[in-house]
UniProtKB/Swiss-Prot annotation:
Keyword Protein transport listed: yes
Gene from which the chain derives: SEC16
Chain's role: Involved in the initiation of assembly of the COPII coat required for the formation of transport vesicles from the endoplasmic reticulum (ER) and the selection of cargo molecules. Also involved in autophagy.
Biased segments, Polar residues type: 238-253, 384-407, 417-442, 629-661, 681-699, 706-722, 1305-1320, 1341-1360, 1446-1457, 1677-1686
Record organism: Coccidioides immitis (strain RS) (Valley fever fungus)
High-level lineage: Eukaryota, Fungi, Dikarya, Ascomycota, Pezizomycotina
InterPro entries: Sec16_CCD, Sec16_N, Sec16_Sec23-bd
Biased composition (Pro residues): 606-626, 1635-1647
Keywords from the UniProt entry: Autophagy, Endoplasmic reticulum, ER-Golgi transport, Membrane, Protein transport, Transport
Region (Disordered) location: 209-253, 290-339, 382-722, 1260-1505, 1529-1564, 1582-1717
Subcellular localization: Endoplasmic reticulum membrane
Cleaved signal peptide residues: none
Gene Ontology terms: cellular component: endoplasmic reticulum exit site; endoplasmic reticulum membrane; ER to Golgi transport vesicle membrane
Name of the protein in its database record: COPII coat assembly protein SEC16
UniProt key word Ribosomal protein: no
Length: 1717
């Protein structure tokens, strides 16, 4: 197209002529008539005055309309040509008009360009000077620059189109005429019409008509000449003889050039063609060569099939190739004749400077003409240098089609070109006439070497085909398939994409390059082509280079590469689908050109791609392709070639064994190891879901994970759902998305595992007892795991014992049982640490700090938790997550402000900071201002109009205010409407407000929902306020359009739900009455849409003003069951969430414990607490679970919850069962079921329960003889303990008895503490408590049992007595020191009591009463009371004088501790008569103590209060008694006990809670007097101990002795309690137990309080002794003597009074009793 512009003709007639001559004649030479040839011959003399119409390659449009009979409109052709020319050569000068080939109008530059065009047409490879047709032709004459030859340019053109035409044009006028005569064998009349039509088209151009007519005529005859042999023969002979004159040759060359220019109109190619003036010379030879091809006379190309039609571009190329060949050998001097100095210099300049060729300036419009097209052709053959050269000799192949470069762009297959060239071209001629050989004036183009080198480049191209076959390289070329030549021209003439495509086939075949120079195109064209061919060949090897040379490789590439590309994408999927496609991997195409780089994939060597196409892709994408495959596939990495694929096939199995690291390396962009599967040689072994894919992939090599390599895939892990999703998202990784992360492990692990499986076969000894028939072969053994209560895990693995036999090389395996191991479940299963650290149960305000810390930790954990696991954010899930965090924050505020959310300024400020962060700092900028700023809308309130006012006025005049209101609304006079409606019914005012909100607020646009809801609340529309957030129509599922809605895009009707926070904040900041109704309504709305957390927040903020918000799941009115749990949508699973239960417990703690006006506990929550306790027990947190059980019992037994419907039999049964199991289970860190008592436990809450048992529960149990149903069965020996006479009940009696004397007192109902029943109850009850309460309970109950055990000992009297004596003697001391010692005697103490059983029987009634009292006393002493409890049987006195004696005893004990010797105290302790009196008191006390009916009750506070009271009373008594009875040592002793009490740990406890004196203190004083009267002994009003002793005397000595013995056992230390030593024992029988007389002085203080009660009972027991504790020492001995029938009696005697007992305890009971006697 640019060629036309160079010639100065825009009409395009020349192009049409070319089509007529090139297309029709070339393809259909038979169409031409002799007349046409004749006309051409005649017209050869016509001067070339219209070269302006330089032939252009036909445009695409022309190609479509290339009908020879009708030419397209001039304007169409011109426009198309102009466009192409401008695109190809933006810098090209305007087309030259009326310029001939010889002389071009314009600058010399333009002339040089035209010359170059001419050269391009002629293709001067030899450099002969007669090439330049531009210079050879004169502007005026239109003849060649060589004056000798007058060539008819039109004829030349016609010949050029037809190859023969070029020959005709090149010859001089005479020669042309001769030739014409020879050629014109057919009439041209037929063709004249066509020529005329073309001339008519070109009528506008000067001389164009004639010129084109000549051209057309010439073109047709040319074709005819091709058909006629004789003419061609003549022409051939003429050429061979060298008759053709240089001028003629130049002319012919010009004609040919013009023809080529037309055909080859390409941006850069034309430039080179234009620069080829030297081509004019070869054009002559071409003429000679072409003539044989075109002329029927001369058949220089017999190789061409006459009947075969060749594309004109092919024929043209052949002509060009042959021209230089013929010219060079035939006429070396022709150049001189043809070329002028100027022309030669210009050509030299053009040819000598390679840069000029590349520059755009040289790329002239004229150059773009035929030269560009020719260059393209040349480029194509140049790339396939060898192939093209060989094929180029036949001129016909390119000659016919050269005229149109656009046609070449049209997509002529390069393969076709190459093949045609191969057939037509004579490789020898091309070689002989290579451009380097024919360079004129000694000019050598730098491209000459490339021509020679072409064959060398061709071999590499050949290599490329093996790599990926031809397709891969072509794929690259295809990708750049035939870009406009102009685009390639810019890089350099060599790279015209148009030229590249034809050579694609050529480069692959690599024909000799020499033939390309032969082509008519200028050497410049050829040279650029060569350069392009080089990169293109390289491109083959590397996929990217292929892209660079798309044109050259295009023909070949398009075929294979396109399929390969789809294969890449499809292959990964198929591979992942476990389908081993034989086709190349989707990525193999890319690697095809770079098969050599394939080694790079070796890094992926872990999995060599199978020899099929897939192997190559795997190397690229799979983490570890086979190394060998990688070598081939490294190129495949870029793009896998078929060759690589084949190599991969062989390698895939080996590389699979490669390490996972290599697999990870597979894709640089894919750090993830998804390719691991590919690396696994034994993919089939992999069990994962991706394994099947691996199975197929094993052959295919690792799946291509290029897409799946992203780290995101690795995160989810193979089993994660996210990974599955990724697999689908990324087909390449779909194959192993899940296993991609596991792949590295699976690869290394599975492959070897698979290999190891067969190797692990063992030869088992088959059983013969029938087990061998077990299909599961369980006789081979299998691991066993068993989960036990309390978070223990039992496991055992079978052992395989080898057995060898003679003659056997390998042993046979005999499975046997393995070791059984236990471990806490926490070591096996992970736990949620934040939840495990919950500081529950929450029973006191002291837990507030811990609760706040825990809440903060949980909030931080929730905020830091990832919102999603798969990278996909679900809006609904995200909203719920945010709402959940807000809920926890609101609960924290509730705890911080002691259960108040509203009504407190601080609490409201905290809530505001939660609902609207930043509002505190920016009150004017945060949400409200932002809301106002974002509000937008076109609707605005209308100003009051006179018309509206008039209407309102009229309505008011008429007295119709309601009508006036709606008139105001209609006119949007809202102020008037509201003012008037306020005087009417409130409903009218609400309606007006609603209308105002709907039309004035909601219409404003966005972010008005919250404000509208607030206005509704102001209007009193509480329930309807939620309609502003979500319209009723939306809730009903309808889509409504508001007439008053503001402008803007429609929005989701449910979007208002996200405004709930702003709405709640507005309500809180603008409180009005009954706004809680709106909050509750908002909560229900949110709950209906699944926003449970937000709903619960609204309910909490609303409070309980509108009714309870918590309830059971079956309660339809309950808004909340568990905070954060949706019981509506998940009625059966909502309780599974532990967080919900714990958060609700925190709420309960804030409202019922921290609140100023505490509300009752949540009754429905207790069942959930019980479930939580079960969970804790399962995890091994038994102590926490037990605490929960106790807390639940305390709440259940409280008065406020007694009648709750939530407490039913099923609940109680579950609670009781869990409590018993926790007691039976070993305590933490202990393997025994008995917990060791400790001081901390003694001071724990367990004492409260112990006190409750002592007060009434134990008594009931004792009377029933079975105790609590669970109590008797608590311990492992509980049932045995049920028959104390048979053996000592393994209760905690001995060791714990000292601490648990109060529980044994319960047997008081049985009538005797010493009775076996009481013993049984005491031990079993104590173990129960000890278990439930850990060491504390155990410690407490054993003492009572100890007391009983003493009496029982008397039953068993022999061995047990000494044991008990020892135990008690030591126990009192040690009891206080450490209940653990008692624990050791758990049940034995009771057994020890058994020997004393007979005595117990005697004293049993007395014991009962003291026992009853003892519980109370024990409640006071707690720790020491237990020891005294052992003596409590003797403490009937205590029932009367409990408090009094306790006080005195305490002082006495401290003072009397040294006088451990007092045996009388023992005897006094034995005095049963006092017990009878005490029994009454004890009974009375029992009546007082029914409060503590159940062990479940926590009476810590009560116990402390009682203890304080008793202490106070005891102090008073001690002071009085010290002043009266102990004036001497008693006073000092009294002080000592005080000090001792302060020193003792019990004293510390009671000292803190010293409150009102207990009634018993008074009784103690009275008891001393009473005892004096009843016994007629021990009358010592001052000394309550003596009084107790007096009361004790009445009972028989023996009976008293056993009882006293048991008591004394507990009281042994009591002797020291007495100032004298005796009063102590009588006064504090329990005290003696706790502290033996000799060395237990330090303990008296605690014993005093705790022992007091025990001492009371002991005092009752040692009637005489207890009565006269101070004075009683002498009486005590008497009693002890009378009672001391045996050692047991002596031992029992130490039951002396409280005071003595307490002191004696520390010193040692046995010491006092035995030694005294």
């Amino acid at each position: 197209m640019a060629e036309d512009r160079v010639l100065g003709h825009e009409s395009g007639l020349f192009t049409d002529a070319i089509h007529l001559g090139a297309w029709n004649p070339a393809h259909r030479p038979e169409d031409f008539s002799d007349s046409v040839l004749h006309e051409v011959a005649t017209q050869t003399s016509v001067p070339i005055q219209t070269p302006d119409l330089a032939p252009c390659p036909p445009t695409e449009f022309e190609l479509e309309h290339r009908d020879p009979e009708a030419s397209p409109p001039d304007n169409v052709l011109d426009e198309t040509k102009d466009v192409e020319y401008l695109q190809a050569f933006p810098e090209a000068p305007t087309r030259l008009e009326n310029s001939g080939h010889v002389d071009i109008t314009g600058s010399e530059y333009m002339q040089s360009i035209e010359k170059t065009r001419e050269g391009a047409v002629i293709d001067s490879n030899n450099g002969s000077p007669f090439i330049d047709s531009f210079k050879g032709s004169d502007d005026d004459t239109g003849t060649n620059t060589f004056p000798d030859d007058n060539i008819d340019f039109q004829a030349m053109i016609g010949q050029t189109h037809d190859d023969t035409r070029d020959v005709w044009d090149r010859s001089t006028d005479a020669h042309v005429e001769d030739l014409s005569t020879q050629l014109v064998t057919e009439p041209y009349s037929a063709e004249n019409d066509k020529v005329n039509s073309w001339n008519s088209v070109f009528a506008d151009d000067e001389g164009g008509g004639d010129f084109f007519s000549q051209i057309s005529s010439q073109s047709k005859p040319t074709v005819a000449h091709l058909e006629s042999e004789p003419r061609s023969d003549d022409m051939a002979s003429h050429l061979s003889n060298g008759n053709v004159q240089p001028s003629n040759e130049s002319q012919q060359t010009k004609a040919i050039d013009s023809l080529f220019q037309e055909d080859e109109s390409t941006g850069e190619a034309d430039f080179f063609n234009s620069q080829g003036p030297a081509h004019v010379e070869p054009s002559l030879e071409l003429l000679s060569e072409t003539q044989p091809n075109s002329m029927p006379e001369d058949h220089p190309l017999p190789s061409l099939d006459p009947g075969k039609e060749l594309p004109h571009h092919q024929s043209v190329a052949v002509v060009q190739d042959e021209k230089p060949e013929v010219i060079r050998p035939a006429e070396p001097g022709v150049a001189e004749n043809l070329g002028e100095e100027e022309l030669a210099e210009r050509w030299k300049a053009f040819l000598g400077d390679d840069d000029i060729l590349i520059e755009n300036e040289t790329l002239d419009g004229s150059i773009e003409g035929a030269n560009t097209h020719t260059a393209e052709y040349q480029r194509h053959p140049v790339q396939p240098a060898s192939q093209v050269g060989s094929e180029q000799p036949p001129v016909n192949t390119y000659t016919p089609h050269q005229p149109s470069s656009s046609e070449m762009l049209g997509g002529l297959p390069a393969a076709g070109y190459s093949s045609t060239l191969g057939n037509l071209t004579n490789p020898e001629k091309s070689k002989v006439e290579s451009f380097s050989n024919q360079s004129k004036a000694g000019y050598q183009s730098p491209y000459d070497l490339p021509f020679d080198m072409r064959p060398k480049h061709a071999p590499p191209r050949k290599i490329a085909p093996p790599v990926g076959v031809n397709p891969p390289p072509r794929s690259s070329s295809m990708s750049g398939s035939r870009p406009p030549s102009s685009s390639y021209m810019v890089p350099g003439p060599n790279f015209s994409p148009v030229a590249a495509p034809p050579p694609v086939s050529g480069p692959d075949t690599t024909p000799p390059s020499t033939k390309e120079p032969v082509r008519t195109g200028s050497f410049f064209e050829e040279l650029p082509v060569v350069s392009r061919s080089r990169p293109s060949t390289r491109g083959r090897y590397t996929p990217q280079p292929n892209m660079s040379q798309p044109a050259s490789n295009l023909p070949m590439a398009p075929v294979a590469p396109p399929p390969s590309l789809p294969q890449q994408s499809s292959d990964p999927y198929s591979q992942f689908q476990l389908q081993p496609p034989a086709r190349l991997d989707p990525y193999s195409n890319l690697s095809a050109p770079p098969p050599q780089p394939a080694p790079t994939t070796s890094r992926y060597s872990p999995q060599p791609p199978p020899p099929g196409t897939k192997p190559a892709p795997f190397p690229r994408y799979s983490p570890a392709p086979p190394q060998s495959a990688c070598m081939t596939s490294s190129a495949t990495y870029v793009s896998q070639s078929p060759t690589v694929q084949s190599s991969v096939n062989a390698l895939p199995f080996q590389p699979r064994t490669s390490s996972p690291l290599a697999q990870h390396e597979t894709a640089k962009s894919y750090p993830s190891p998804p390719r691991k599967r590919g690396s696994l040689p034994v993919t089939s072994i992999i069990p994962t879901s991706s394994v099947p894919q691996f199975g197929s992939d094993s052959q295919i090599v690792p799946p291509k994970r290029s897409m799946t390599q992203s780290p995101g895939r690795m995160m989810p892990l193979q089993s994660s759902v996210a990974s599955n999703q990724n697999a689908y998202v990324r087909p390449a990784s779909a194959h192993g998305s899940k296993s991609s992360i596991q792949a590295p492990l699976l690869q290394s692990a599975y492959a070897p595992a698979a290999n190891n499986r067969p190797t692990q076969a063992l030869d088992f000894v088959v059983p013969t007892d029938g087990q061998e028939h077990d299909p599961l072969e369980r006789w081979k053994g299998a691991p066993i795991f068993k989960f036990g209560f309390g978070g223990t895990l039992l496991s055992t693995f079978p052992k395989h014992i080898p057995r060898y036999a003679t003659g056997q090389m390998t042993p046979r395996i005999k499975p046997t049982l393995g070791d059984i191991k236990t471990c806490p479940i926490s070591q096996i299963l992970p736990h949620n640490e934040p939840l495990d650290k919950f500081p529950g149960p929450l029973k006191s305000k002291s837990k507030k700090k811990d609760v706040l810390t825990w809440l903060s930790t949980m909030i931080s954990a929730l905020e830091g938790a990832p919102s999603t696991t798969d990278g996909h954010v679900d809006p609904v899930h995200q909203h719920r997550r945010e709402d959940g965090i807000l809920l926890w924050k609101v609960v924290r505020v509730l705890v911080e402000h002691d259960g108040a959310l509203r009504g407190s300024t601080a609490a409201e400020a905290s809530l505001q900071s939660i609902f609207s962060p930043g509002s505190m700092a920016m009150n004017s900028q945060f949400e409200y201002p932002s809301t106002g700023d974002s509000v937008s809308g076109s609707l605005k309130s209308e100003s009051a109009s006179s018309l509206g006012i008039d209407v309102i006025h009229k309505s008011l005049v008429a007295g119709d205010r309601q009508k006036a209101v709606w008139d105001a609304v209609d006119h949007r006079l809202w102020g008037h409407a509201m003012l008037i409606s306020s005087t009417l019914d409130k409903s009218v005012w609400k309606q007006v407000t609603q209308e105002f909100i709907r039309r004035e607020v909601r219409s404003l646009g966005k972010n008005t929902e919250s404000l509208a809801a607030l206005y509704e609340i102001f209007a009193g529309n509480f329930e309807e306020s939620i309609d502003e957030l979500v319209p009723p129509s939306a809730r009903a599922g309808l889509q409504m359009v508001s007439v008053h809605a503001g402008t803007g895009a429609p929005k989701d009707a449910l979007e208002g739900l996200n405004k709930w926070r702003d709405t709640v904040n507005l309500i809180l900041q603008n409180k009005i009455a009954q706004d809680h109704q709106a909050l509750r309504a908002l909560g229900r709305l949110l709950a209906s849409y699944g926003r449970v957390e937000a709903s619960h927040i609204c309910s909490l903020v609303a409070g309980t003003a509108a009714g309870p918000i918590f309830g059971d799941a079956r309660d339809p009115q309950a808004s909340i069951v568990l905070l954060g749990a949706d019981h509506w949508r998940n009625p059966t699973t909502f309780m599974v969430e532990r967080e919900a239960c714990l958060l609700t417990e925190v709420y309960e703690f804030a409202t019922s414990v921290l609140a100023a006006s505490p509300s009752p506990s949540l009754a429905h929550l207790q069942a959930f607490k019980l479930r939580h306790a079960m969970y804790l027990a399962e995890e091994g947190h038994k102590s926490e679970a037990q605490q929960y059980c106790e807390a639940i019992v305390s709440i259940v037994t409280s008065k406020s919850n007694v009648k709750s419907p939530y407490y039913h039999q099923r609940f109680f049964a579950e609670l009781d069962e869990l409590s018993h199991r926790l007691r039976q289970a070993p305590t933490d860190g202990s393997s025994s079921w008995i917990s060791k008592p400790s001081m901390e436990k003694v001071s724990g809450s367990m004492w409260a329960k112990f006190n409750s048992f002592v007060s009434g529960d134990d008594n009931e149990v004792t009377s029933n003889g079975s105790g609590k149903g669970g109590d008797g069965d608590i311990g492992p020996f509980a049932k045995i303990a049920g028959t104390p006479p048979i053996s000592r009940s393994p209760s905690v009696a001995e060791g714990h008895g000292s601490y648990f004397p109060s529980q044994p007192v319960a047997p008081s109902s049985s009538g005797s503490r010493y009775a076996p029943n009481s013993q049984y109850y005491a031990p079993y009850s104590s173990p129960e408590q000890s278990r439930g309460r850990r060491s504390l309970d155990a410690q407490r109950s054993p003492p009572q049992t100890a007391g009983r055990s003493y009496s029982q000992r008397r039953n068993s009297q022999d061995p047990s007595t000494p044991l008990e004596g020892n135990a008690y003697g030591s126990m009192p001391n040690h009891i206080y020191a450490s209940p653990a010692t008692i624990g050791s005697h758990i049940t034995p103490p009771q057994a020890s009591h058994a020997p004393l059983a007979p005595v117990e029987e005697i004293y049993s009634p007395q014991i009962q009463s003291p026992t009853s009292e003892m519980p109370a006393i024990q409640t006071l002493p707690d720790g020491f009371g237990i020891n005294q409890t052992g003596y409590m049987p003797l403490a009937e006195q205590v029932t009367r004088d409990d408090e009094t004696n306790l006080k005195t005893t305490t002082t006495e004990q401290s003072g009397y501790q040294p006088p451990t010797y007092e045996p009388p105290s023992f005897s006094t302790g034995y005095e049963p008569p006092s017990y009878s009196a005490n029994v009454e008191d004890n009974e009375h006390s029992d009546e007082e103590k029914p409060k503590k009916k159940s062990f479940m009750d926590d009476d810590d506070d009560d116990f402390m209060a009682r203890a304080a009271q008793l202490r106070a009373s005891e102090k008073e008594k001690m002071d009085r008694e010290a002043a009266e009875a102990f004036r001497k040592a008693a006073e000092a002793d009294a002080k000592r006990p005080l000090a001792t009490e302060k020193k003792g740990w019990f004293s510390g406890w009671f000292g803190k809670k010293e409150s009102g004196g207990a009634v018993r203190a008074d009784l103690g004083d009275e008891n001393s007097f009473y005892f004096d009267k009843e016994l007629n002994r021990w009358v010592n009003k001052k000394d309550p101990g003596s009084a107790a002793t007096a009361a004790v005397t009445p009972p028989p000595p023996k009976s008293s002795a056993p009882s006293s013995q048991s008591v004394s056992t507990s009281q042994t230390p009591t002797t020291p309690n007495l100032t004298n030593g005796r009063p102590g024992p009588s006064a504090v029988p329990g005290g003696t137990l706790s502290a033996p007389p000799p060395g237990i002085a330090p303990l008296p203080t605690p014993p005093s309080s705790s022992l007091g009660p025990p001492s009371d009972s002991p005092r009752a027991i040692p009637r005489s002794v207890s009565a006269g504790a101070p004075t009683g020492p002498p009486s005590r001995p008497g009693t002890s003597l009378s009672n001391a029938s045996s050692i047991d009696d002596l031992l029992g005697a130490p039951q002396a009074r409280k005071g003595g007992t307490m002191k004696t305890r520390r010193k040692g009971r046995g010491y006092v009793d035995v030694m005294a006697k």
